[in-house]
Amino acid sequence: MVHQLKLLKDDFFASDQQAVAVADCYPQDVFAEHTHDFCELVIVWRGNGLHVLNDRPYRITRGDLFYIHADDKHSYASVNDLVLQNIIYCPERLKLNLDWQGAIPGFSVSAGQPHWRLGSMGMAQARQIIGQLEHESSQHVPFANEMAELLFGQLVMLLNRHRYTSDSLPPTSSETLLDKLITRLAASLKSPFALDKFCDEASCSERVLRQQFRQQTGMTINQYLRQVRVCHAQYLLQHSRLLISDISTECGFEDSNYFSVVFTRETGMTPSQWRHLNSQKD
């Protein structure tokens, strides 16, 4: 019998009074599936990788935000210069009188929407608070834990203000072109995406945007879109009874044979093999 790897508080928190800490991953290596006896917020700064959360794969890159409950199981694979930070916390140790339940999806149970995105503005402000939080949580001086918890509360509220669903920026958003491009790509799972049209609408240089995207994510635009679609296909193959031809259409592939070729190249298995193997987990 294979035992689930579990990360424990005693290995990450300085004392049983500490409620919050910061765990840097510069860069994040491949990490086997695991759970914790604490919760965490995960913010991705740059690079890319495959994050599998409760059997759902996400192709992650800059701006991705996850709320991870202690009971959630997750892993990292196929990482490429993936830089992220884990803000870890113990719900039962928090003393500040905030509506933690309302502010943090899945605060008390593994439920709610775990995956969100942050634009460049939110990321910049979050990075500043996390820097202060990291400093306070490593101090052995009076009121360090209280200061860290205050900063954690500020961070949680900031994330609430700036986060948005992966495929939908707020209509009044003033985020950067790169943020808008990643959102448009996430909204193009089922429909074709035309970069030239996007650049015409945004009055920007296609060449410059391609360079900026690759610099920040470590992928080309086409690679990212293809891998996001394959991740969605993996989820549908495991959790739905749709025909493979229908899944191909749902994931933006007009030809099911081409879908099978791409899927096999990205995962090392045909769609049928993937479905069979992963259906045994359910």
Swiss-Prot record:
Database matches in Gene3D superfamilies: Homeodomain-like, Jelly Rolls
Single biological process term from Gene Ontology: positive regulation of DNA-templated transcription
Transcription keyword on record: yes
Keywords assigned by UniProt, alphabetized: Activator, Cytoplasm, DNA-binding, Repeat, Rhamnose metabolism, Transcription, Transcription regulation
Record domain HTH araC/xylS-type: where: 179-277
Pfam families named among the record's database cross-references: AraC_binding (PF02311), HTH_18 (PF12833)
PANTHER family hit by this protein: ARAC-FAMILY TRANSCRIPTIONAL REGULATOR (PTHR43280), HTH-TYPE TRANSCRIPTIONAL ACTIVATOR RHAR (PTHR43280:SF13)
The name this protein goes by in its record: HTH-type transcriptional activator RhaR
Gene behind the chain: rhaR
